Amino acid sequence: IHAHDWLTYPAGVHAKMVSGKPLCIHVHATDFDRSRGKVNPTVYSIEKNGMDHADCIMCVSELTRRTVINEYHQDPRKVFAMHNAVYPLSQELLDIPRPDHSKEKVVTFLGRITMQKGPEYFVEAAALVLQRTRNIRFVMAGSGDMLNAMINMAAERGIADRFHFPGFMKGKQVYEVYKNSDVFVMPSVSEPFGIAPL
């Protein structure tokens, strides 16, 4: 039985109890990562219960592994780091044309627009950069509970004319955004092992 992250742990634990089969959980992040240290006791309890019942705990990074061992008091012998990986890109994606940016550079944030990903730092940094030069465009691609706040923040800083918010991206759109970028910025305040840089 394989359960991914805390929302599936109760089902995984139940399946283990009913079937008698071993449970392996996959920890992509803990509430310590998602909450900037303001851990929700309910979420922590669900995470800990899943880990306590797991026969094997796979973590996306050594950082997450240490958090699981130290903060959730798990036996290090059952906790392993299993890093995310990617497949090589298809020729179609490799052949996406790169626009000419000789007059204007593009700086991109691509990810969930949530507290954990630090989008406000991207907007603040953009405001500082744009005080020095205006030949840069900023792209904040993604969706999340902070999207409207980031749109408002860009407007309040007087930089909305240099910002583009294309929304959630998937498939080929993601590669087109990357190919159109001169710089990718990942201002995450906690990133156990992000998919975006892969």
Give the location of each predicted region.
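Carbohydrate-associated surface elements
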Residues: L63, A85
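Conserved donor-binding/catalytic core segment of Leloir-type glycosyltransferases
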Residues: D100-A126
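Short His-centered aromatic/hydrophobic patch
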Residues: A3-T8
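Nucleotide-sugar donor phosphate/pyrophosphate-binding loop at the beta->alpha transition
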Residues: S19-C24, F32-N49, P88, E92
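Short alpha-helical donor nucleotide-sugar binding micro-motif in glycosyltransferases
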Residues: F168-M169, E176-S181
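Nucleotide-activated donor-binding/catalytic signature segment of Leloir-type glycosyltransferases, i.e.
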Residues: A149-M169
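Aromatic "clamp/platform" in nucleotide-sugar-dependent glycosyltransferases that forms part
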Residues: V189
